[in-house]
Amino acid sequence: MESFNVVETLQPAERALFWVGALITASLALYVVYKTITGFRIWVLGNGDLLSPKLGKWAVVTGATDGIGKSYAEELARRGFSMMLISRSQEKLDDVAKSLESTYKVETKTIAVDFSQIDVYPKIEKGLAGLEIGILVNNVGISYSYPEFFLHIPDLENFITTMINVNITSVCQMTRLVLPRMEARAKGVILNISSASGMFPVPLLTIYSSTKAFVDFFSRGLQTEYKCKGIIIQSVLPFFVATKMTKIRKPTLDKPTPERYVAAELNTVGLQDQTNGYFPHAVMGWVTTILAPIDLVLNLGLRMNKAQRGGYLRRRKLR
């Protein structure tokens, strides 16, 4: 009995379509398998002991006294790094430094500066002199007090300057100070904390969103420049984390504590040049940038932020 071959019964045009469909199906299947394996490596296996003082004795964290920055300092100290903490309040810096020394038995140093001022970098450069820096976490950043239309932002001229100095200039200048010695030793890690707000425009948070898009592009460009020299530069784009800045008090699965977020994010270093840092955030990033049309994302953002703006102004009777 002769075997029946479906392909041979098709007309030439139908046969071509059949093979195109088969090729597309096979490609999609391979893509799913690849992404599954890659995801397992990133979110389950992690990067092992990549982040250790073998990179360099010291880790530097800006904005190190609260939220995500403080959690980076704690986690890196737990891994054995001596910590250089840079933030505005010397009192808060001293409190965090004492806690790290007591809990993790590591050496600490502090530099108190206001990153909204552009004349602070000679002081920072002097404080960093002679340190073997393995990791730099560019975390310091500011956002809006509440969502607002561009022309209605109080003290707009100063707001623009301050936002750029803290969110953009600090990243560039700190990288300028630290990267040369990393390049000379052919190893080092720079983590630039951007935001999911930098993945797409966010109406009523437009300046903040734009500064975070800069941080993302800056990080990815530098990684391409310096990856071949043994240096890792990663763009980190978290969604909401339960911190003072976000005003989220109760953590949830999609709004984790900073400790939980940082522990997850550090496992992605060396595996992703651009990361949302935390699996639920990675899913949210895929939905907002790949699945959902950008116009829908923009309109939803506008509606949500207008509602938050209205609530803020009503509470303060400013509307």
Swiss-Prot record:
Q: Does the keyword NADP apply?
A: yes
Residues the record lists as binding NADP(+):
56-85
The enzyme's first-digit EC class, named in words, is oxidoreductase
Pathway, per Swiss-Prot/TrEMBL? Lipid metabolism; fatty acid biosynthesis; Steroid biosynthesis; estrogen biosynthesis
Catalytic residues, per the record, are Y208 (proton acceptor)
Residues the record lists as binding substrate: S195
Topology versus the membrane: Multi-pass membrane protein
Catalysis: reaction(s) = a very-long-chain (3R)-3-hydroxyacyl-CoA + NADP(+) = a very-long-chain 3-oxoacyl-CoA + NADPH + H(+); 17beta-estradiol + NAD(+) = estrone + NADH + H(+); 17beta-estradiol + NADP(+) = estrone + NADPH + H(+)
User: What family, per the record?
Assistant: Belongs to the short-chain dehydrogenases/reductases (SDR) family. 17-beta-HSD 3 subfamily.
Q: Which PANTHER family match?
A: RH59310P, VERY-LONG-CHAIN 3-OXOACYL-COA REDUCTASE
Protein name, as recorded: Very-long-chain 3-oxoacyl-CoA reductase-A
Source organism lineage?
Eukaryota, Metazoa, Chordata, Craniata, Vertebrata
